[in-house]
Amino acid sequence: MCFWTNLSVWMILLSHSLSLVSSTETGKTLTQNNSRAGSQGLLEVLRVLSAGDHWSLNHPQSLIKILLERTGCPQRTDWTQGDCKLCLEADALLLTAGGNLEDELREEVVQRVSLLLLYYIIHQEEICSSKLNMSNREYEFYLHSLLGLRQDEDSYFLSEKETDDILAFTRKYFGTSSSQCMETKILQRESGIQGSNGADEKTLPQLAATIIALSLQGVCLGRKALPSPDDFTEYIFSFLNSTNTLHLSEIEQLLNMLTTRRTCAKEDKYLHQYQRKQNTEEHSLRDPKTSTAMDKESDDHSPSWDQACFSARQLVEIFLQNHSSLSISKEDFKQLSPGIIQQLLSCSCQMPKDQQAKPPPTTLEKYGYSTVAVTLLTLGSMLGTALVLFHSCEENYSLILQLFVGLAVGTLSGDALLHLIPQVLGLHKQEAEFGHFHESQSPIWKLLGLLGGIHGFFLIEKCFILLVSPNTKGLPLVNEHVGHTHHLGLNPELNDQSSGGKSISTIQLKGPEDSQTTVLPIGNVPASNRNGKTISLLAIMILVGDSLHNFADGLVIGTAFSSSLESGVTTTIAILCHEIPHEMGDFAVLLSSGLSVRTAILMNFLSALTAFAGLYIGLSVSADPRVQDWILTVTAGMFLYLSLVGMLPEMTHVQTQRPWMTFLLQNVGLVLGWFSLLLLAVYEQNIKI
């Protein structure tokens, strides 16, 4: 009798399962009976499970208890002995779903109970540990909790990704087989879900009933069947000669292919279709808000598995069934070898070239390109000294200086915020790994907005000074900018005075605590001072400070080129734009201290050579990536301080004869510096040197 009862149960379950799986994927409208298949199927399963117990058929509380036992203890095989320890009560579950303990069990109540069971499956640990009591909430709370499973999805619909997350939980919970799985879209159609948005408040309970009914029958849901181990071996043999045997020459050919990777050139059309899954199913089961380790399939068809990129966990699942350990033994590796070889031959896991992370620069590249960069930096400092020699026109000198000061602020702050900080935080590595432009560039746009806030407040303050108090005396022309290597501020006032047909230029030196100005004519410096053998203390201070500054610049450039060629290029541009106005101020102070033009140029050149010493020290100490990150972190802070604390206030309070033209050139320099660093930050992966 028991045999025939069990046989009838399994025949009914099998017929119901086949009726669901055999449904076609055509676009025909589902009938009302099909849309209600989930709840009716679950009721049918409950009636079969309670066969022989006529009392339970007429009491909804007993049916819900049977459903709760089967759902709460899915791995239990012997249902005739012992009790199942449940974390839910059938009465509370039925009342929360809007049912009655005495009335007949309605389909709507069955669907709601199924939805509550899905919530229980997802949050079983919290519920069973008494951290979450389901009887304290209304049914609508659980409904909206499932609809809002992912924060990045529409909270009014259960999207396909959210459905995949739920099905991943149910597969793990019920321990269903990974073969002959029903696809998510077929499951949605069986539940009466017509739209592309997914299930809503009305259709989600039907979907929940279908999921519970099929899971109780052991049907795998939401994931296509993985290939068998023999399929990988078949692929390898078919790839080489399409027979059941391999010759030694073909084994040699296989080794050559794996060594040279020539086979990947033949499969370039597949490289853009697949990527290795970043989140394994185990991770997805722990966090429903993240995506599961499932292939994103097209609406019409899914790709063949032989061009699919399998994760390490999936290969273990295919070749080593019931393998729960994270370690792989030698015997296990022997079984995994065909899968690894097949993945290498198919090239399905190789990323496109434009998304591959670039290798670190070689020793020759680091030393070669960085030496060229420091050489250009030295020549750029000489350009700054050359601009001071054109002091005959005070107005043009002031405008050129402010243009370069704005350019220095833009490049220094832009390099720190758009390049160095994202690099030390690892954002560039994520961009190279995933290759999604809009997603990976999101931090860059946010940091650009930060620069926009800085520029906006600079405009407000500058306009306030120009419009409200145009006659207020500002700070000297170049104050802190040229003073970070010494303690003197510099205000070049280039006054053209007619004296025997000669133009006399003067430079005003102004200390931070001195309110009086000392006028030192460049052209009328006493010969005893200009040709004397002694060098003033001011010149020595400038020489030492400038040497240390250039040494630090070389150290930073060496570290940047050790990290990547792109980082070296951006850092060199930022330092070069900063160095030109800096050297203009230092050279002017050297001339005013009594040195001749030739001596001042020589001293400026000698101090610039210390950058090479810093360069080669930086290249040697920054071989370790951790050292690189720390040096670049300090460099970003130094750049922000120099640009925002030292030079931007000077731009705000500069005193000039043409304030609006100065204001325009300052903004041109700022925008040009930020825009150039933005282009480098966005397209640095495409830079080829």
From Swiss-Prot:
Motif placement: XEXPHE-motif: 578-583
Feature: compositional bias, Basic and acidic residues: 278-303
Disulfide bonds, paired cysteine numbers: none
Residues making up the signal peptide according to the UniProt record: none
Reaction(s) the record says it catalyses: Zn(2+)(in) = Zn(2+)(out)
Residues on Extracellular side: 1-201, 391-397, 469-536, 622-629, 684-689
Side of membrane Cytoplasmic, spans: 223-369, 419-447, 558-600, 651-662
Protein's UniProt name: Zinc transporter ZIP12
Organism: Mus musculus (Mouse)
Lineage of the organism: Eukaryota, Metazoa, Chordata, Craniata, Vertebrata
Gene transcribed to yield this protein: Slc39a12
